[in-house]
Amino acid sequence: MEKKKVFIPFLYLISIVFLPWWIYLSFQKSLESWVTTWWNTKQSETFLNDIQEKKLLEKFIELEELRLLDEMIKEYPETQLQKLGIGIHNETIQLIKMHNEDCIHMILHFSTNLICFLILGGYSILGNKELILLNSWVQEFLYNLSDTIKAFSILLVTDLCIGFHSPQGWELLIESIYKDFGFADNDQIISSLVSTFPVILDTILKYWIFRSLNRVSPSLVVIYHSMND
């Protein structure tokens, strides 16, 4: 009976770790054909965000320049002009295909991640007892650590998350999440998140040290500040 009580929360922890990957892969495969069919047959309006519109505009400007060049080079033989016109036509078709693939990719990733979060949320609510037991195990483990190890762990985590070199890590993380949801790169949004998110975390950490740790373990706060200095 005791082994069963230990095994169930441990199995729940493993399922939480691997369940998102399984949900993501399974739903992505099942939704891919449906999203592709819907976009190619039912979509009547062109869906563009600012980044996609800018890229398409740049491509069409290039094609327009080629067309003007086609009109200017009148001394070329007719066969050469025909080849140039065919090349512009093929490039336009390829551009439209790339646009459709980008839109399908964005819708597919966004819908898959949304379904994944909803399922994980329901799974966490149903497994509330297991989460409470896992939380008690973590608290017991942290309680048995010495104040020096606790202070070192807090200092290590804070330096990794909000230290001097953390903006590069946050930029990579936010870009990966941004792309995982299917959105196009937006340097302004990514830069604003990189510049503000670590500051918010630093403020929350200082407030937590001041309110919680200073009340629960003043010696830990003293050791932390000594190591930080």
Swiss-Prot record:
InterPro entries, sorted: CemA
Catalytic activity: K(+)(in) + H(+)(out) = K(+)(out) + H(+)(in)
Topology within the bilayer: Multi-pass membrane protein
Protein location: Plastid, Chloroplast inner membrane
Cellular component GO terms, alphabetical: chloroplast inner membrane
Presence of the UniProt keyword Transport in the record: yes
Transmembrane segments: 7-27, 106-126, 154-174, 189-209
Entry keyword annotation includes Chloroplast: yes
Pfam families membership: CemA
GO molecular function ontology, one term from the record: antiporter activity
Keywords tagged on the record: Antiport, Chloroplast, Hydrogen ion transport, Ion transport, Membrane, Plastid, Plastid inner membrane, Potassium, Potassium transport, Transmembrane, Transmembrane helix, Transport
GO BP annotations listed: potassium ion transport
Family: Belongs to the CemA family.
Family matches, as PANTHER family: CHLOROPLAST ENVELOPE MEMBRANE PROTEIN (PTHR33650:SF2), CHLOROPLAST ENVELOPE MEMBRANE PROTEIN-RELATED (PTHR33650)
HAMAP family in alphabetical order: CemA_PxcA (MF_01308)
Function field: Contributes to K(+)/H(+) antiport activity by supporting proton efflux to control proton extrusion and homeostasis in chloroplasts in a light-dependent manner to modulate photosynthesis. Prevents excessive induction of non-photochemical quenching (NPQ) under continuous-light conditions. Indirectly promotes efficient inorganic carbon uptake into chloroplasts.
Protein name: Potassium/proton antiporter CemA
Taxonomic source organism: Spinacia oleracea
